[in-house]
Amino acid sequence: FFSVRDPKNGRIDRFITVANQETKDDGATILAGNKKVLFARLSDAKFFWENDVRMVRAEGMALWINSLAKVTFHNKLGSERERVERLAKLSKDIAPYVHADPELAEQAAMVVKADLASQLVYEFPDLQGLMGSYYSNICGLNPEISVACQEHYAPLGPSDKVPTAPVSVAVALAEKIDKLTSFWVIDEKPTGRKDPFALRRAALGVVRLLLENELRLPLRDAFSMSYPGADQDNLLN
């Protein structure tokens, strides 16, 4: 499906579908089938969204954060809950270098992965980060935290925008530095033929975050503050 957005209000209210065959009814049957599939998916999304919102309003995001203990980050690196603890500490340590409030950066890092435990993101993984920003807004968290939920994965590629909000930058740097150091420790390094954990992208993300925001960060110190046992000299060579 190709979404069509109304330029006046920004809403997606149409879609385009493509078929490689002609039909006697000028595609009416194909269109009806696609409408049925799309309606079912959107109905599922609405159901999961409403369930998530009820849970967030009743319990906040703490239940999701704790349930990340059951979500594996990597079988040699523990759970997403353990990773969240590392990100919170590292974000707080990095914050002064990027002009962010350390306590706010730490709080943001504690919730940016919470939506991984939500029903909607479980069914629609591409929405991770975006849904975290919505849920944190519902919880009444600081707006900078909501922005960080959506932006901490960025930049995802050369054409992706780099976050500029200080808290977002702190958490985004921590996310990428933790990924680099942790996978280096277990000797899962990229090669000329493969990079299954997108470590090159993470490294380029660190560089872009610093250069495009005109920031300076002692990387040796950042690596040593990250995953236990990381060899900062090996990472920088």
Residue ranges and their predicted role:
Residues 1-237:
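Amphipathic alpha-helical "coupling" segments that flank catalytic cores
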